[in-house]
């Protein structure tokens, strides 16, 4: 389906929530290190409940490693940022697209964000003078909009519990 990328996430329950979202939508979750917590953190595990076994989660030692190992189509990668120039709702998404989110306290590093063409720097609408949405909420809104655009197409295969 879609690829969710969290670059240097800091808050365990947010990542747990995104793991649960990935399991329920058929998305693959990519975690770009360093992480601000242990993958065994009880708060992260609690937020993800028993969905960890249903989600496909890959860890990457850095952004360059993700690009090298996964070889994504760069034209289908979207940076979600409050500095975005285009709304998620004005963008057409395709199965296999990549949604890249930054750390909770600082977003995407500017040097990474600037590698995305302006049309691939997306934002979620908010009221003026508001800083940002919670990371897991922003991921959920984006994934569900992309999935809606694709008629809630079910992925061909679902990861099975071990």
Curated annotation (Swiss-Prot):
<dbReference type="GO" id="GO:0002131">
    <property type="term" value="P:wobble position cytosine ribose methylation"/>
</dbReference>
<dbReference type="InterPro" id="IPR016914">
    <property type="entry name" value="TrmL"/>
</dbReference>
<feature type="binding site">
    <location>
        <position position="102"/>
    </location>
    <ligand>
        <name>S-adenosyl-L-methionine</name>
    </ligand>
</feature>
<dbReference type="InterPro" id="IPR029026">
    <property type="entry name" value="tRNA_m1G_MTases_N"/>
</dbReference>
<comment type="function">
    <text>Methylates the ribose at the nucleotide 34 wobble position in the two leucyl isoacceptors tRNA(Leu)(CmAA) and tRNA(Leu)(cmnm5UmAA). Catalyzes the methyl transfer from S-adenosyl-L-methionine to the 2'-OH of the wobble nucleotide.</text>
</comment>
<dbReference type="Pfam" id="PF00588">
    <property type="entry name" value="SpoU_methylase"/>
</dbReference>
<feature type="binding site">
    <location>
        <position position="124"/>
    </location>
    <ligand>
        <name>S-adenosyl-L-methionine</name>
    </ligand>
</feature>
<feature type="binding site">
    <location>
        <position position="132"/>
    </location>
    <ligand>
        <name>S-adenosyl-L-methionine</name>
    </ligand>
</feature>
<keyword id="KW-0949">S-adenosyl-L-methionine</keyword>
<keyword id="KW-0963">Cytoplasm</keyword>
<feature type="binding site">
    <location>
        <position position="80"/>
    </location>
    <ligand>
        <name>S-adenosyl-L-methionine</name>
    </ligand>
</feature>
<dbReference type="GO" id="GO:0005737">
    <property type="term" value="C:cytoplasm"/>
</dbReference>
<keyword id="KW-0489">Methyltransferase</keyword>
<comment type="subunit">
    <text>Homodimer.</text>
</comment>
<keyword id="KW-0819">tRNA processing</keyword>
<dbReference type="GO" id="GO:0141102">
    <property type="term" value="F:tRNA (5-carboxymethylaminomethyluridine(34)-2'-O)-methyltransferase activity"/>
</dbReference>
<comment type="similarity">
    <text>Belongs to the class IV-like SAM-binding methyltransferase superfamily. RNA methyltransferase TrmH family. TrmL subfamily.</text>
</comment>
<dbReference type="GO" id="GO:0002132">
    <property type="term" value="P:wobble position uridine ribose methylation"/>
</dbReference>
<keyword id="KW-0808">Transferase</keyword>
<dbReference type="GO" id="GO:0003723">
    <property type="term" value="F:RNA binding"/>
</dbReference>
<dbReference type="InterPro" id="IPR029028">
    <property type="entry name" value="Alpha/beta_knot_MTases"/>
</dbReference>
<dbReference type="GO" id="GO:0141098">
    <property type="term" value="F:tRNA (cytidine(34)-2'-O)-methyltransferase activity"/>
</dbReference>
<dbReference type="InterPro" id="IPR001537">
    <property type="entry name" value="SpoU_MeTrfase"/>
</dbReference>
<protein>
    <recommendedName>
        <fullName>tRNA (cytidine(34)-2'-O)-methyltransferase</fullName>
        <ecNumber>2.1.1.207</ecNumber>
    </recommendedName>
</protein>
């Amino acid at each position: 389906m879609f690829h969710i990328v969290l670059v240097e996430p800091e808050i365990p329950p947010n990542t747990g929530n995104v793991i649960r979202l990935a399991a329920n939508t058929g998305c693959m979750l990519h975690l770009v290190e360093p992480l601000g917590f242990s993958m065994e953190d009880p708060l992260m595990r609690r937020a993800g409940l028993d969905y960890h076994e249903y989600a496909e989660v890959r860890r990457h030692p850095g952004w360059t490693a993700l690009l090298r190992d996964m070889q994504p189509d760069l034209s289908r990668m979207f940076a979600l940022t409050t500095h975005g120039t285009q709304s998620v709702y004005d963008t057409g998404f395709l199965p296999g697209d990549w949604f890249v989110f930054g750390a909770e306290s600082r977003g995407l590093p500017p040097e990474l964000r600037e590698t995305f063409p302006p049309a691939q720097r997306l934002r979620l609408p908010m009221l003026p003078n508001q800083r940002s949405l919670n990371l897991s909420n922003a991921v959920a809104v984006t994934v569900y909009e992309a999935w809606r655009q694709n008629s809630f197409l079910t992925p061909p295969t679902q990861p099975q519990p071990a």
